[in-house]
């Protein structure tokens, strides 16, 4: 039986590779990204195996809505990959308060919101 994956940050890098690997083994994927244009081509390439959704993981309401839409479309979710995130590079004393807050919003709260949304 194939699995249904929910992958954040699927527009590039590891997220995109996770999508391609899951589809290659016969699974279906909800591919999310802040900019939906970054994942639409995956649906074109893989057809019904990929549902592209726009999702800014820092928006708790959007995370709940995306999970609801994904579940309505595929009937369930089996695997969640909280891949959306980014790093800050450079001297720590040069990181601004806003940069730190943005990183915490995505890398910590984004994971929390998506995980809470998929739990029963």
Segments from the language model and where they lie:
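Conserved hydrophobic beta-strands of the Rossmann-like cofactor-binding core
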Residues: 4-7, 80-81
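Conserved glycine-rich cofactor-binding loop
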Residues: 11-12
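Conserved glycine-rich Rossmann-like NAD(P)H-binding loop of the short-chain dehydrogenase/reductase
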Residues: 25-41
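A glycine-rich helix->loop->beta "capping" turn
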Residues: 48, 69-82, 88
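The beta1-alpha1 cofactor-binding region of Rossmann-like NAD(H)/NADP(H)-dependent oxidoreductases
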Residues: 55-65, 97
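Hydrophobic positions on the long internal alpha-helix
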Residues: 66, 81, 114-118
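Substrate-binding pocket helix/loop in short-chain dehydrogenase/reductase
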Residues: 91-92, 96-101
